[in-house]
């Protein structure tokens, strides 16, 4: 039966239903109205649908769908809709963007992606962010000329930062806004690189790296025991008794500091106070004026190798192979008056020292297998944690957690306030010499020649990084983009996880 025949039959059926002399759409007696029964109406609609073309069925479907499903974004104010969307994760938001043009427009709102970015706890370079906002506020070009202009070229901010077209979206007036969706995507790729071990590795000591022509050295040829860096400089200490100051981006050695008569085993710096502090196997601690490249003070007191040193706003804290840690006043008028406390109690070498200004507590790690916490004001021992089965070689303390590494081949995470063991990580095949952590990850280095990346919250090992000479790893530091580590073979290695990514804002 063709569609025309279907149509004739339906018309006949409707005519029969409505030709009854007693039929009235307003009849108070339901039984006298054939269409008052829902089943009859359903049958009629089925017959009507069967008589329609495909296009007609689609039109009816769309109408019925609109009756069954209500788009909440058309009912609620836009601010409420955005609040609802803010509870979704990245994958769900991307799926929602495919639902309709209206949802796509709403979900390109930068506020949602900014909230997601912040919920992740991801780093934002506040200086660059403020520079962008300062530049944005001073430009009031009309749309579309300004928008088209920005889409075609990079922009230099007031302090020299280059901003790229993909970093912007535009409001209804054509003014640029920061594209938080783009920033989220770039940082998500960066996190994925960390989890899956995607990186580029290079070295500060690579012969392909050019050094300034007026320098008679290229890099240290002896073991490098310690490194520390920020956005501008890196400082390293080595067996050749020197402290090297590098430009962290060009990888040029800017200068060397001479003063120790033994290997430089540890160092720390405070840019706010323009202070660099180093500890040595000659048992001394030197405070350097690194801009004038000379020692300011030399502290004597330890009777063996100085293995750890921390500088804060008011104190220097050091640890030594002589079984003690010491607290030194930075504002002392003479080195003889500088020693504030000698922290005694460990039964073996104190290999690492940490300090948190938030809690006022010092944490020491020793070859006697214990961690100890101390009050910096009184010098009293607050807690002893029997942490490992063998000596502890390294530790970090952030005010809430202590993470330690040992020759028992484990990394352990402790709650600092109670000493409770939270998690134990296994994977290294030799002594764990250095460990660092943040809220998301732990990075460790050991005598097995590896650097390992772990999930702080689950203990899962993400990846293992090797150096070309399989050399012992002595020290490391990391940020959100890279790891820098030093080794027994004199190499300073850099693993970059941000290759090909736009990290302008983080």
Curated annotation (Swiss-Prot):
Limits of the F-box domain: 70-116
GO molecular function, one term: ubiquitin-like ligase-substrate adaptor activity
GO biological process, alphabetically ordered: meiotic cell cycle; SCF-dependent proteasomal ubiquitin-dependent protein catabolic process
WD repeats: 219-256, 259-298, 301-338, 345-386, 388-426, 427-464, 468-505
Compartments, as annotated in UniProt: Cytoplasm
InterPro entries documented for this protein: F-box-like_dom_sf, F-box_dom, G-protein_beta_WD-40_rep, WD40/YVTN_repeat-like_dom_sf, WD40_repeat_CS, WD40_repeat_dom_sf, WD40_rpt
GO cellular component: cytosol; SCF ubiquitin ligase complex
UniProt entry keywords in alphabetical sequence: Cytoplasm, Meiosis, Repeat, WD repeat
UniProt cross-references to Pfam families, sorted A to Z: F-box-like, WD40
Superkingdom of the organism of origin: Eukaryota
Location, primary (coarse class): cytoplasm
Record bears the keyword Cytoplasm: yes
Stated role: Has a role in meiosis.
Record's subunit section: Interacts with skp1.
Entry protein name: F-box/WD repeat-containing protein pof11
Gene source species: Schizosaccharomyces pombe (strain 972 / ATCC 24843)
């Amino acid at each position: 039966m063709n569609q025309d025949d279907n149509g004739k039959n339906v018309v006949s059926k409707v005519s029969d239903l409505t030709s009854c002399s007693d039929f009235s759409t307003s009849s108070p007696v339901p039984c006298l109205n054939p269409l008052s029964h829902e089943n009859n109406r359903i049958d009629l609609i089925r017959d009507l649908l069967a008589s329609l073309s495909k296009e007609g069925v689609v039109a009816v479907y769309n109408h019925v769908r609109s009756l069954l499903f209500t788009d909440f974004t058309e009912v609620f104010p836009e601010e409420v809709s955005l609040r609802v969307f803010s509870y979704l994760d990245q994958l769900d938001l991307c799926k929602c963007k495919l639902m309709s043009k209206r949802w796509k427009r709403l979900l390109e709102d930068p506020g949602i992606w900014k909230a997601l970015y912040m919920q992740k706890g991801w780093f934002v370079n506040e200086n660059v962010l403020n520079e962008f906002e300062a530049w944005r506020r001073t430009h009031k070009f009309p749309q579309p000329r300004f928008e088209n202009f920005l889409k075609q070229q990079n922009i230099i901010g007031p302090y020299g930062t280059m901003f790229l077209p993909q970093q912007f979206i535009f409001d209804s007036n054509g003014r640029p806004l920061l594209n938080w969706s783009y920033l989220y995507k770039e940082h998500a790729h960066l996190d994925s690189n960390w989890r899956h071990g995607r990186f580029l590795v290079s070295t500060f000591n690579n012969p392909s790296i050019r050094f300034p022509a007026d320098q008679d050295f290229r890099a240290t040829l002896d073991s490098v025991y310690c490194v520390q860096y920020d956005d501008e400089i890196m400082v390293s200490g080595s067996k050749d008794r020197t402290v090297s100051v590098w430009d962290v981006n060009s990888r040029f050695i800017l200068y060397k500091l001479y003063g120790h008569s033994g290997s430089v085993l540890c160092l720390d710096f405070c840019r706010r106070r323009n202070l660099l502090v180093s500890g040595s196997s000659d048992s001394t601690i030197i405070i350097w004026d690194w801009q004038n490249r000379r020692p300011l003070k030399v502290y004597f007191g330890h009777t063996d190798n100085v293995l750890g040193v921390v500088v804060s706003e008011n104190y220097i804290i050091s640890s030594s192979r002589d079984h003690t840690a010491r607290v030194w006043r930075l504002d002392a008028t003479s080195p003889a008056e500088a020693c504030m406390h000698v922290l005694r109690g460990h039964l073996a070498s104190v290999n690492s020292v940490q300090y948190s200004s938030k809690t006022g507590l010092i944490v020491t790690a020793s070859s006697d297998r214990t961690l100890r916490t101390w009050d910096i004001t009184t010098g009293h021992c607050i807690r002893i944690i029997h942490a490992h089965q063998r000596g502890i070689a390294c530790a970090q303390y952030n005010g809430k957690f202590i993470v330690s590494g040992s020759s028992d081949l484990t990394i352990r995470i402790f709650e600092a306030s109670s000493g409770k063991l939270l998690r134990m990580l296994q994977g290294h095949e030799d002594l764990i010499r250095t460990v660092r952590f943040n809220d998301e990850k732990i990075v460790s280095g050991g005598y097995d020649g590896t650097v390992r990346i772990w999930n702080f919250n689950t203990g899962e090992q993400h990846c293992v990084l090797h150096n070309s000479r399989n050399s012992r790893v002595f020290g490391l530091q990391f940020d959100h983009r890279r790891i820098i580590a030093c080794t027994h073979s004199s190499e300073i290695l850099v693993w970059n996880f941000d290759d090909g990514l736009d990290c302008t804002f983080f």
